[in-house]
Amino acid sequence: MQPPSRRTLLSLGLFTLTACTVAACTTDRTGPAPGATGPRPDPDAPVRLRAVAATDALLTGYDTLPAPPGVDGAGLRAETARHRAALAEGLPATAVPSPPVTTGPTAGAPPTTAGPATAAAPTPATDGLAALELRTAESHLADLDAAGPSLARLLASLAAAHTLHAAALGAPAPPLAAPPTASASATPAATPGEAPGVGAAAVTALQNALGAEHAAVYGYGVVGARLPDDPARTDARTAYAAHQARRDTWQRLITSLGAAPAPAAGGYQLPFPVASAADATRLAAHLETRLTGVYADLVAAVPAPHRLTAALALRDCALRARRWGAPDQPFPGVPDPAATPAATTG
């Protein structure tokens, strides 16, 4: 058997894809208006203010309801405060209310378990906080279509983060989103970018997502082969089927836009040797974590009608990564805003 070609190695999006490829191709709707001497009002400001208000309600919930034993409520609240800061970035200080100050119980005992995550046992207080987290996630998803590309990407990431918080608080995971069929508005006779609102950058991002799903399907074949016949292998089969469905969805959508879907490579180079069940579990977590970045970029690249599909795919990958033992990320799929120097304006 010949070794994988250079094309094969480069096509392994999950293992070698750089997260900035699509982000660099998208632009927001801000900047000076023609003929104006200064920046025009940020059209994302109303969306940001709504998201900040929803986050403030959640912070107040953490100050009112105690976290259950074994859950780091203070840590979840601190992450939520970081979400608020990211959402308020760029808003005039006079337009943003002061954030809630911690006054009530949020601290539970820090988690002591390691390995694949398990949910806390539901309690009345847990249900209250978890419901607030899920409500905040839904509010962010509801505003995807009203946001500019970068803000939509952030909202999708935060919706996934709040769903992870709800899982940590004991809420059952939401049902996995069913991959939709290709939009009827795009016909097979169309050329790339000819369908309403779909340009070349969006088609490129869809091809990247398709390539990543090809790699995930291959990767889960390796995962399943290294796991014993137990619930973990059942989880791997379920994930394998989910990624096949996503792959098929992107193939249909790309075809409907008049482009040729990228084929799967003959083989893929794994990020590390997979010789045991522990290695297989680690690979599954790696696959899902890498996919969150792919789908965050897709949210920013596609037009509004397709953003929710990409955002739900991001959420599902984040939940599966957690199930496989990956640590929860404060900003799934996107760089931590606190680690990125803020741009200055003159």
How does the language model describe each region?
Residues Q2-G346:
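All-alpha RGS (Regulator of G-protein Signaling) helical domain and cognate RGS-like helical scaffolds
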